[in-house]
Amino acid sequence: MSNEVKKNEELIEKLVSVKRHSKTVKGGRIMSFAALTVVGDGKGRIGVGRGKSREVPAAIQKAMENAKKNMVSVNLNNDTLWYPVVSNHGASKVFMQPASAGTGIIAGGAMRSVFEAVGVHNVLAKTYGSTNPANVVRATIAGLAKIKSPDEIAEKRGLSVEEIQG
């Protein structure tokens, strides 16, 4: 369950979790492994993937390929967020807020992997409710995806950035 960090094609690949599954059949149990991975470019693109196989390396490889196919763009303010955001997925609820330079990533396991892969270096984050890694990762990515920059908000409201920021 440790994180694996590999630079491949300038992508940061993180292993979030590996679980063992078993299927009971007439002849006994069939074991398989499910992997959850996060892939990012460190510049605002992030993807999550799941893979399942009879062997751990094959499950991780499938999860990495799946994550690369499901990448989304995230709007960042240099190396932190624009404003605090709350998001949830299933019974997992995550709260993320920007932090000043030098703070680092103050977040739990699954969320930390997402922030490291997407390129956020200063953030404060907390998980409420379920800490299931799959739901926490999905909630974190959903929260990051719904963040808009002041430019986008100003354009949507028909105002200038100065009027919005006060």
Swiss-Prot record:
Lineage: Bacteria, Pseudomonadati, Pseudomonadota, Gammaproteobacteria, Thiotrichales
Gene behind this protein: rpsE
Protein name, as recorded: Small ribosomal subunit protein uS5
Entry GO terms, CC: small ribosomal subunit
Keywords: Ribonucleoprotein, Ribosomal protein, RNA-binding, rRNA-binding
Subunit structure: Part of the 30S ribosomal subunit. Contacts proteins S4 and S8.
Domain notes: The N-terminal domain interacts with the head of the 30S subunit; the C-terminal domain interacts with the body and contacts protein S4. The interaction surface between S4 and S5 is involved in control of translational fidelity.
Record-stated family: Belongs to the universal ribosomal protein uS5 family.
Job of this protein: With S4 and S12 plays an important role in translational accuracy.
SUPFAM superfamilies (alphabetical): dsRNA-binding domain-like, Ribosomal protein S5 domain 2-like
Entry-linked PANTHER family: MITOCHONDRIAL RIBOSOMAL PROTEIN S5 (PTHR48277:SF1)
Cited Pfam families: Ribosomal_S5, Ribosomal_S5_C
Ranges where the S5 DRBM domain occurs: 11-74
